[in-house]
């Protein structure tokens, strides 16, 4: 019994030390948000969160009853998630939305900058519109009901949203208002260097866990096509 208590205390101490060191070293993430650098190639945490999100959404949808009822194969789900959803929808749509709303001057001076996805700059609203359009094309190609498919897709979306918001946090972007709270962070991208709310983490919790639970509860209470999609 004494050994178990000592061992438990040691584990607890090590865990707290790990968390403390992780918090202290968060500035390294903000200053250099790259997971791996091989010559000119840089793999950023933000890009990794996008990929992880897509993979988890893929496995989630493979097991969803609506996907099975529709009769989509694994290859169909693969195409829908990675080609239609991630590339054409989220990335291309997100980039176009960002450039049209926030990078108009750059777009006018250099129209090809629309395709410079590696420079960053993705709009949530543009990505949402892009995903909707991409799924409409996919549904037309597969001859399936759009709202029937989106009822399954929106249940998986909070998984991606929650993880990508963590990527925004590690990227030091989309930070919140100034705060005097101990939970505030100083982001290198902030020209004023103020302590700010980690709004990305708030959104990760709200758009991730909370939204997933709400949509799951709504889905369990109704079989009407389009209801879950409309709540999303």
Give, region by region, the residue ranges found by the protein language model.
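Hydrophobic, membrane-interfacing alpha helices
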Residues: 20-232
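Short, positively charged and aromatic/hydrophobic N-terminal segments
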Residues: 15-19
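Polybasic, lysine-rich low-complexity intrinsically disordered segments
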Residues: 5-6
């Amino acid at each position: 019994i004494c050994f178990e208590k000592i061992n438990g205390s040691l584990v607890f101490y090590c865990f707290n030390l790990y968390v403390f060191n992780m918090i202290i070293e968060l500035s390294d993430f903000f200053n250099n948000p790259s997971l791996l650098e091989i010559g000119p190639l840089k793999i950023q945490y933000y890009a990794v969160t996008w990929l992880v999100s897509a993979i988890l959404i893929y496995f989630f949808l493979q097991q969803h009853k609506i996907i099975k009822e529709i009769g989509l194969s694994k290859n169909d789900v693969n195409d829908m998630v990675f080609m239609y959803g991630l590339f054409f929808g989220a990335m291309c749509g997100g980039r176009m939305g960002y450039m049209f709303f926030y990078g108009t001057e750059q777009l006018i001076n250099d129209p090809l900058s629309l395709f410079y996805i590696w420079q960053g700059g993705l709009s949530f609203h543009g990505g949402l519109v892009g995903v909707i359009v991409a799924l409409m094309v996919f549904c037309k190609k597969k001859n399936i009901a759009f709202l029937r498919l989106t009822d399954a897709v929106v249940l998986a979306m909070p998984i991606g949203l929650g993880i990508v918001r963590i990527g925004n946090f590690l990227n030091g972007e989309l930070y919140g208002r100034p705060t005097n709270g101990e939970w505030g962070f100083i982001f290198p991208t902030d020209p004023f260097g103020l302590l700010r709310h980690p709004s990305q983490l708030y959104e990760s919790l709200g758009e991730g866990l909370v939204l997933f639970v709400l949509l799951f509860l709504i889905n369990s209470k109704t079989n009407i096509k389009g209801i879950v999609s409309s709540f999303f």
